[in-house]
Each structure stands twice: as structure tokens, then as C-alpha cells.
Amino acid sequence: VKFGMPAGYSAATLGWGYYEFKDAYDSLGQTAHLKEITNRFSKYFKDCTTLSGDTVTNFCYQIGQGGGGNDHGYWGPAETQEAIKGKRTAYWTSNGASDIAAAYSAALAVNYINFGNAEDLKYAKALYDFSVKYNKSENETTSPYYNSYDYYDDQAWAAGWLYLATGDSSYKTFLDTFMNSSGQGMSGQSGCQWGVYSPMNWNNVSMGAAILQAEITKSASDWAKVTTYLDSKATSESQYYCEDTWGSARHNVAVQMTALITSKYKKESGKDYSSWAKAQMGMILGDNSTGKNLVVGFNENSPKYPHHRSASGHAYDPTDEGTPKWDAENGHVLVGALVGGPTGTDFSTYNDSITDAVSNEVALDYNAGLVGAAAGLYTTYKTGSLESSIPGVGATPTTTAATTTTTGKTTTTAAVTTTKAAETTKAPTTVAQGDGCYTKKVNQDVVYKELPAADK
């Protein structure tokens, strides 16, 4: 399933991390890899959008269905999902999904700022105009997942990036209004008149909008709306910050990232949360009462059973997700994925089980915050290095890496793209004998049944 809301959030958050901590990516040789990822997101968002001149006529906000007996009801790699192959519904709208249109807009705008693709800015402006024209939240789908509460915060987030990209004062005016509103939007969603009220996440990007506003104005009162919230969260360097039982680590790293950005501007914000963020990241990476860390493939104490279909290597069972026998270790190592984490402040509540989506699910939006926080910490402390012993880390970025998995037995890596070929003429597959790696040009088919056994 391609869910528009978390995709837009993840792409914009990745781009934001680069925007704030560019030197960290550059000094570690990660800029090309980051650009490859955000450009791929941006291409997808543009491909999902139909323009007539500079006006959006309609756009696709979701592909596939998350519920019932569709994608979410199937366990196994997408390549073997023959029953649904070619039959997924694409959800388009000509007058709604303002939240997702704004999320796409923000991601495209920040990618334009970072890397200068004029087409990204063109689509970002058009999607923003579409969003504020209709002021209507996500259209109805059969999916019960990632339903957004509102669109006002997403529009303000996009407006902030568009102002930075263009200098057009109309975007700044919209952001100003959001920052001083107490009740607007579809269901009376509050702006930030009384300050930030939620951690940065796919369903509420008010924190991001507020930080952009404070960066632009350099106003002590605008920064206070950010720091008052962060002060209430960054309270202990010895206790794990748990915002919510489900996917607590995702919220932890998102607050780390926003706290580190705020610390970057400490002359204006008056706050430095760097030490708190470093302590929290230490807990996530194993400095806790159990010694377990929450990043797959990081070391021997990493999660072994993340809730991820392709990485599991397990075959489909017609019964529901909770009943198959998941006694075998995952067939592939999903290197770098952040799992959900403890359900409380005590790490003993973390459960490394493939059937536990609360503690062990992985997601794009989880990792987006992790990457930004890591870049912020490296910028601040200038310590650490690329861990070359982890397969795939430190390698020259390729143009095809849509998914990277590592087989549990051979520790070989395989970058797989499952996108439909744009042309009928295909570049030959090259296989490096003995290491299980192969390469493909962008948008070329990978035929699952023809792959070497180790790569499957």
C-alpha cells in the first residue's frame, strides 16, 4: 500500500533533517544517498499529480487498500502476492484530501530548497493552491489506516517551506495566521496561538510549522511556543521518554530531532537540549537496563524479529496475522530500521516479537526522525564514524536501492526495485558472483522468480 499521509511526512522530515544539518551528511558522504531517496519520493508525488498549466486537476493520494483481505491481510514479500498483482485501486480526488496535498507540497518544496529542481517547486506550489482551495480532509477510502484529523497544520507546514523557497509573502501570511489561531480547520483544529501541543508526527506537523516560523521571525515569543512544549518532554536524561505505548521510539526520535534543531538556534531560542537528546539516543542504541537496542542490524543486541513482511522471509498463511507459527528467525536483516520500542519508560516492556506490531513494527515515518536526530547529534558532537562492518553501510550509493535486505545466513545484501518498467527495452542484470548483489537501472523490472535463491 502507498499511503499518502505518512509518505509526505517522511519525505519532508528527511529533507528537513538535511536542510538543518547539511554538513553532517556532506562530511559523512551521505548526501548523494539522501538525495536519491528524497528525489524518488518527489518523483512519486509528481507522478501522482495531474496538472493543467499550473493548476492541479486531480491527484492520487493512496494506492491499494490497507484493510480487510487486501495488502494488510497478506503476509509475505510483495513479489509473491499474485492474487492482488495489477489489481490495486488508485484513489484520486479532484476536490479533496487537502491534508495529503499539503503534505506532498511540503516535501516537494523542501526538496527544491535542498537540491534545486524547478519542477519540484512548480508542483509544490500547485498542490498547496489545491489544498487551500478545497479545505477538505482525506477522502473516504476502504482503509482504516493513517486517517488524518485535519489539514490546517499540513497547510501551515507547506506554507513555511514555500515561503523559504520563494520569499512570497502570501505564504508567510498563512503561516502567521496559523501561529496565532486558536480554532480553524475542518474540525476546529487549533493553530499555535497557545503554543505547540503535539510531537512532530505524520498526523500533526504543528511543531515543524512552529519551528519554521521561529526561524523566520527570530522572535522570542515564537520560539517560546516551541520551547515550552519541549521543556515538558525533555525532562530526564536517565529515563526513556515515552510519549505513547504504540511506536514510542518514533515519537522519541522525532522530539530529539526537533529539540536538536531548536538547540541549533539557541541564541534565539535560549535553549540547548543536546545533552538530553544524546542520552535518549544512547538508550535507543542500547544504553538501557536491558542492553537491547531498537535499530535492526546495528549489533548483536538488535531486534531479530521486526514486524515486516518482506524481511521476515516467512510464507503466507491463510489464517490471520497472529496465528501462524513465527518460530523461525527472520530470513533477512532489515538493516537500519527503527522498531516501535518499549510501551513505557522501562525498557523491559519492549517485546522483540514479529507478531507484536506495537513494539516491533517498522515504518518510514519512524526512520525519518531517527535519521534527522542522528544528523543533529553528529553536527553537535562530531563523534562516531560509519560502521563499515554492517553490510551496505558506507558503500557508494546506487540509483536503484528501493529496499535493502540482508540474508540472515549469508549476510549478503540485495537492493530490490519493484517499480514497473518505463520502457520495453531493459538493461541487463549484473550479478556479482559470490556476494549475492545485483544492480538494476531505475524503473527496470526485477522478476522475483528469476532471482538467485540468496537474493529472494
Where would I find each of the regions flagged by the language model?
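Long, well-ordered core segments of solenoidal/helical folds
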Residues: 37-53, 122-139, 166-196, 219-240, ...
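Extracellular mucin-like PTS domains
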Residues: 397-430
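Aromatic (Trp/Tyr) and acidic
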Residues: 1-17, 61-111, 152-170, 174-177, ...
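Secreted, propeptide-processed cysteine-rich mini-domains
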Residues: 434-449
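Structural signature of Gram-negative outer-membrane beta-barrels, strongest in the C-terminal barrel
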Residues: 136-148, 153-157, 164, 178-181
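Active-site acid/base region of carbohydrate-active enzymes
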Residues: 36-83, 117-122, 126-128, 135-147
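Short, flexible helix-adjacent loops and helix caps
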Residues: 19-26, 50, 113-116, 136-143, ...
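N-terminal structural segment of carbohydrate-active enzymes
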Residues: 1-43
